[in-house]
Amino acid sequence: MTLKKSFSASLLSPFLIICLIALLSVPVSVGARRLLEEPKPEIPTFPELPKPEMPKLPEFPKLELPKLPEIPKPEMPKLPEIQKPELPTFPELPKMPEFPKFDFPKLPELPKPEETKVPAFTMPKFPGSP
C-alpha cells in the first residue's frame, strides 16, 4: 500500500507543477499583449518660458596670502650605534645513525579462483497455466 502511495505521489507532483506553470503563464502573456495593443495618450507639450537673466556678481580681488619665512630643519644629533650582544653558541647535536630500509618478503601470487558455473534453471510448466 505504501509503495503505491509513494509511486502515485512521485508521478503526481511533476504533473501538478507543470499544470501550475501552464496556468500562471497565460494571464501574463495576455496582459503583455493588451499593453502593446492599447494606444498611449498623447501628452501636450507646454510652451517654453524664457529664462530670466541672473544678475552678475561683482568680481572681488583675490587676496594674496603673506609668505611665511622658511624654517630650517633642526639637525638631530647622531646616536652612537649600540652593539648587539652575541648569541650563545650551542653544541652541535650528534647525528642519528641511519637505519637500513627493511625489505619485506614478497608474497607468492595466489591463483584466482574460477567462477563456479550454475546450471540454468528452467521453470516447469504446470497443466492449466499459460
From Swiss-Prot:
InterPro entries attached to this UniProt entry: PELPK1_2 (IPR044659)
Coiled-coil region: none
Region annotated Disordered, chain positions: 71-130
Main location class: secreted
Bias kind Basic and acidic residues: ranges: 71-84, 98-117
Annotated Gene Ontology cellular component terms: extracellular region
UniProt keywords, alphabetically: Cell wall, Repeat, Secreted, Signal
Stretch forming the signal peptide: 1-32
Region spans: 13 X 5 AA tandem repeat of P-[DEGQ]-[AEFLIV]-[QPT]-K: 47-125
Sequence repeat copies, ranges: 47-51, 52-56, 58-62, 63-67, 69-73, 74-78, 80-84, 91-95, 97-101, 102-106, 108-112, 113-117, 121-125
Source species, domain of life: Eukaryota
Subcellular location(s) of the protein: Secreted, Cell wall
Protein name: Protein PELPK2
UniProt organism field: Arabidopsis thaliana (Mouse-ear cress)
Gene, per the UniProt record: PELPK2
